[in-house]
A protein has these predicted regions:
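A polyanion-binding, active-site-adjacent surface
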Residues: 12-212, 219-226
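Sequence termini and other peripheral, non-core segments
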Residues: 1-3
Length: 226
């Protein structure tokens, strides 16, 4: 895969916002490194930018920002923290859904967060690929300029957006993009759902987001999974 081919995987509606912010060389280097990877890469290449396909730039109301895809076959589906229905539920998903159930109905057996993405929640990771069996294995492969550009594109849109960075890499990415909690955007950082310190469990992030939206006289986000 060439750099141009990699860039061509980005949905057209997002390309215009990213053009000029990520040098061509960055795409070329990233494509080369991905091509040199000897292990299986998750998810499949057609799903690397799935988050952008499902949630258009103009439709983004919130961004849940994670670290990287699941390194187990069949679990990564191109949406941060989401697992196809019918797959084993990772502990991180279990914890996320337990918190979401404080706000809305979560049907038993649901693990895919696709309905959230369709409602304007961009489910993005700071790194969009992972080698089989090694979480964080592509953290330094070159995705950072691309995902940073995506965050800046969202932040530059008119209207308020809620940014929910979960984990240190996600919080750092929001900081690099210059996104601040203030009069326009809402930033609700948290530990990663798998972290033991500063427990995600019981933190009610979804209720907090909806309360912040209420204060801005904006519609709440529907976190249900029917």
């Amino acid at each position: 895969m060439t750099g141009d081919q990699l860039r061509g995987l980005i949905p057209v509606g997002w390309q215009g916002a990213i053009d000029g912010t990520v040098p061509k060389m960055e795409f070329e280097q990233l494509a080369r490194r991905l091509g040199e990877e000897q292990r299986d890469i998750f998810p499949a290449s057609e799903q690397w930018f799935r988050a952008l396909e499902v949630t258009s730039l103009t439709a983004v109301r919130a961004v849940i920002l994670g670290q990287d895809p699941y390194p187990t076959e069949g679990q990564a589906e191109g949406l941060a923290f989401s697992v196809p229905d019918g797959q084993d539920m990772p502990r991180s998903v279990e914890r996320i859904l337990n918190e979401a159930a404080r706000e809305d109905t979560i049907a038993p057996g649901r693990t895919s967060l696709l309905p959230w993405a369709r409602r304007g929640v961009l489910l993005l990771n700071t790194t969009l690929t992972v080698p089989r069996g090694q979480a964080g294995g592509h953290a330094k492969i070159g995705w950072q300029p691309v995902t940073d550009a995506i965050l800046r594109a969202v932040a530059s849109q008119p209207g308020s957006v809620v940014f929910m960075p979960w984990g240190a890499p996600a919080r750092e990415a929001v900081g690099r993009a210059g996104i601040l909690d203030g009069h326009l955007h809402v930033v609700c950082p948290s530990v990663h759902p798998m972290e033991r310190r500063g427990s995600f469990i019981g933190s009610n992030p979804f209720g907090y987001v909806n309360e912040r939206l209420r204060r801005l006289d904006l519609a709440r986000i529907d976190w249900s999974l029917d």
